[in-house]
From Swiss-Prot:
Record protein name field: 2-isopropylmalate synthase
NCBIfam families per the UniProt record, alphabetical: leuA_bact, PRK00915.1-1, PRK00915.1-3
Keywords (A to Z) from UniProt: Amino-acid biosynthesis, Branched-chain amino acid biosynthesis, Cytoplasm, Leucine biosynthesis, Manganese, Metal-binding, Plasmid, Transferase
Listed InterPro entries: 2-IPM_HCS-like (IPR050073), 2-isopropylmalate_synth_dimer (IPR013709), AIPM/Hcit_synth_CS (IPR002034), Aldolase_TIM (IPR013785), LeuA/HCS_post-cat (IPR054691), LeuA_allosteric_dom_sf (IPR036230), LeuA_bact_synth (IPR005671), PYR_CT (IPR000891)
GO biological process, one term: L-leucine biosynthetic process
Annotated Mn(2+) binding sites: D1, H189, H191, N225
Domain Pyruvate carboxyltransferase: 1-254
Similarity section: Belongs to the alpha-IPM synthase/homocitrate synthase family. LeuA type 1 subfamily.
Gene Ontology cellular-component terms listed: cytosol
Length: 502
């Protein structure tokens, strides 16, 4: 279901990689494709079926004979699999989409179940748009489906219309009014159109549902599906009131989220619950102080429990002395090595001007007593880039290093930005590794600015750089020069500390 959100279909290799990640994280059942939809999807289901051993695989099918046959044949290499059949049951869908009455819908559903039982005894049936289906009709079709062998009854909130107490009401009615409901598991499949997919899923658990369908990062059609990692951690953290558990390997959550984000080319919003970059970061001085004293003060989840290990305190003008001292301590400095009052005063001035401050900025303030802007050693005076049709790019630059001007050029097949970076490196000769490159549009139209953020590793330490210009190549060059100045600044601090030790 998550693939419906993507602008382009995933390759077989990418789908297999995701399936292996889901197996490693410990999902009970994974829906690996819709085999009838395309030859490529049929092939991917075949290949995944041969490689997944610890999770049960499942394929989707309409109540159409060829769909069901394709699903069964595609998964035939697996020893244990499920066929998931779906059919709309709401009056709206029956009348305007299917042009059928409810009696015909029941007949179609029963036919499909009987066909699927030729391949496996594990059948799941989704009453599409169940949340807008009359409760009488829903109870009636569910009873007949279970009678004919369906083991999992899925109740989808197909358009994300339901609120938690409504879905809870539906589940409770099924448990109370369907006499053979004990022979099946009730599942829910929620969409996030009103932002309630996770809340609805939790409400369904409390009402008696025992299978939750979702996707990692909530990827899905329109506003997305239930974010699986959010439901998982809600169950873990609030087991006291939910009274259920999962077989999930929690430490794989963060890693799995990042891999799927990368494969699907769908960035994770910073404020995304559980896996967002800000999920365990703290900017307020009061919060930072509280977290440093005891992380439970402001963190209900131990970040390491999901594979996110490092405590992240953002150094901004809202940060207090505790955060500054924490960063200095992390870099190996004792309280007696610097004056916290002077450092904090200088830090606030820099934070007001710069926005976010980094560890190497603190070092400069503490031991050189100058703002980083005053320590700019490198200044890009000129650059020119030429790219030709054979893929080669040549960059020529003039870089002022202190009082001396250097001229350098570089040719590469990796594009104009790489050509500039190589030319800069020839002059500065810092052994750096580019770890992250991000381009962000600032504004719209021809006057829009491109902001480039880069992250560099130098001598096992991270350095950040930002560049802003109307041309992204110029932004990229400025970002690298910014990084080089930060590295040079850190080197000056090291020299100063070595002198103090003599």
């Amino acid at each position: 279901d998550g693939e419906q959100a993507l602008q382009a279909s995933l390759s077989v290799k990418e789908k297999l990689q995701i399936a292996l990640c889901l197996e490693k994280i410990g999902v009970d059942i994974m829906e690996i494709g819709f085999p009838i939809s395309s030859p490529g999807d049929f092939k991917s289901v075949q290949i995944i079926s041969k490689n997944i051993k610890n999770s049960r695989i499942c394929s989707l099918a309409r109540c159409v004979e060829k769909d069901i046959d394709a699903a069964g044949e595609a998964m035939s290499a697996s020893n244990s699999f499920r066929i998931h059949i779906f059919l709309a049951t709401s009056t709206l869908h029956m009348e305007y989409k299917l042009k059928k009455n409810f009696h015909e819908i029941i007949d179609m559903a029963i036919f499909a179940v009987k066909r699927a039982l030729r391949y496996t005894d594990d059948i799941e049936f989704s009453c599409e748009d169940a949340s807008r289906t009359t409760i009488d009709n829903l109870c009636r079709i569910v009873e007949k489906l279970i009678y004919h062998g369906v083991k999992t009854i899925n109740i989808p909130d197909t358009v994300g219309y339901t609120v938690p107490n409504e879905l809870s009401y539906i589940i409770k009615n099924l448990l109370e009014r369907v006499p053979n409901i004990h022979k099946s598991i009730i599942s829910v499949h929620c969409h996030d159109d009103l932002g309630m997919a996770v809340g609805n899923s939790i409400s369904a658990i409390q009402a008696g549902a025992r299978q939750i369908e979702g996707t990692i990062n909530g990827i899905g059609e329109r506003a997305g599906n239930t974010a699986l990692e959010e439901v998982i951690m809600a169950i873990k953290v609030r087991e006291d009131i939910l009274g259920v558990s999962t077989n999930i390997n929690y430490k794989e959550i963060y890693h799995t989220s990042k891999i799927i984000s990368r494969i699907c080319n769908m960035p994770i919003p910073p404020n995304k619950a559980i896996v967002g970059s800000n999920a365990f970061s703290h900017s307020s001085g009061i919060h930072q102080d509280g977290v440093l004293k005891n992380r439970k003060n402001y963190e209900i989840i131990d970040p390491s429990s999901i594979g996110f290990k490092k405590l992240k305190l953002n150094l901004t003008s809202r940060s207090g002395r505790a955060a500054v001292k924490y960063y200095m301590s992390e870099m190996g400095y004792k309280d007696t090595d610097y004056n916290i009052d002077e450092l904090y005063a200088d830090f606030l001035k820099l934070a007001d001007k710069k926005g976010q401050v980094f560890d190497y900025d603190l070092e400069s303030l503490a031991f050189i007593s100058k703002h980083p802007e005053e320590l700019e050693h490198f200044c890009l005076k000129f650059f020119s880039v030429q790219s030709i049709s054979n893929g080669l790019s040549t960059a020529s630059i003039k870089l002022l290093c202190g009082q001396k001007l250097y001229i350098e050029s570089s040719t590469t097949s990796n594009g104009p930005v790489d050509a500039i970076y190589q030319a800069l490196n020839k002059i500065t000769n810092f052994p750096i590794i580019l770890q992250k490159f991000q381009l962000i549009a600032k504004g719209k139209g021809k006057d829009a600015l491109g902001q480039v953020n880069i992250l560099i590793e130098y001598k096992k330490r991270k350095f950040h750089g930002i560049g802003l210009a109307t041309d992204f190549i110029e932004s990229s060059a400025k970002a690298m020069v910014n990084v080089l100045n930060n590295i040079w600044q850190a080197e000056q601090v090291n020299k100063k500390l070595q002198e103090l030790k003599k």
